[in-house]
Amino acid sequence: MALERIAPGRELPHAPGWYGRAILINLVQVAITFATNHLWLDLLSGVSLFHLARLENAVMQGFIGWFVGTFVFYWWHRVRHLPGFWVVFHQVHHSPARIEALTAFYKHPVEILTDSALAAIIMYPLLGSSLEGALWFNFFAAAGELFYHANIRTPHWVTYFIQTPELHSVHHQLDVHHYNYADLPLWDRLFGTYRDADTFAARCGFPRNNERQLGRMLLFHDVYKD
């Protein structure tokens, strides 16, 4: 976030009330994350398909889990763009005109909770991770989301390894909201949803000032074309 202030990637539009909305939703994200860490461990640990905890190295557990998670979440991300799923889970995240680090976790609480549960299913009953490994998974996933939502410029070669802010601006582009779903562009390239970009999309978010209708979005009203 400091780098965004020192060397911003582009000038972001003025969005009345944005910081208040963003801080509120980000606090909800933090609260849900902390509240569910031990809950998922209690509910989902025990029997697992694999036994990642045997590695003992929690960082490696988290990294392997994150890599597997990028594939699972690629498909879950595509599902969230389907009619019905979009309104319930994902339109809040796509509504802001400003794509910056604060936007990374600007999500409907239902989406936050569902993402948290899916990550826990990957780490516990699927991979058999320890709690420490799951926390590292969260770290890698959060770092990735903060990076590719950040308002910073990146060299094009980075796109061969990880999603960049330029690539992800296409995903949030006004009247597009498609392409570049994955943390790893590998999955988008393999499944035909990759769109290359070395500059930022001109406009992102919802038309007019519809992003300000946060209350209606939280109540599952589709506000995109209002």
Residue map of PLM features:
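Membrane-helix interface linkers and caps
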Residues: M1-A22, N37-R54, T199-R203
